Amino acid sequence: MKSIKWLCVALIMMLSACAHVTEQKKQEHLEAKQKLFMKALRWKSYETAASVIRYRNTARQLAPIDGLDKITVTSYDLVGSVPNTEDDTVVAQALFGYIQNETGRVYQIKHTQVWWFDDELKQWFLDSDMPDFKLD
């Protein structure tokens, strides 16, 4: 009887450790997706950045991205993020520095990002528009 009790305790500990590893992996995947999005904008790979965006509301459309070649992103920083476990989303704040190519003006913009996890595909997607850069 005593060994069954210890076996149950060990099993519970292992299961809770597995859940922690799964959540940690999920967090690592989110960070990788966020980095991909921001690096893609930085290096003018706008199609790659757009591929990260998938709206939960399928009626929503991505705005045209062809005007983005008028700016150059010079820096990006993930300022903070807040997870919402109820609907498996994370709201993050990113700060982008950029230059208007024609004028040479330097700007900064804060971008609120809503990330959601697709359980079927086991991937994170951005449910927000591209940053609202001043193009001219």
What do the predicted segments below correspond to?
Residues 1-7:
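Bacterial N-terminal signal peptides that target proteins for export
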Residues 10-13:
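Short, linear, compositionally biased motifs with a strong N-terminal bias
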Residues 15-17:
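C-terminal motif of bacterial Sec signal peptides marking the signal peptidase cleavage site
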Residues 19-21:
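Bacterial signal peptide processing site
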Residues 26, 31-33, 41-91:
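Short solvent-exposed beta->alpha transition segments
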Residues 85-136:
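Exposed beta-sheet edge and beta->alpha loop/turn motif
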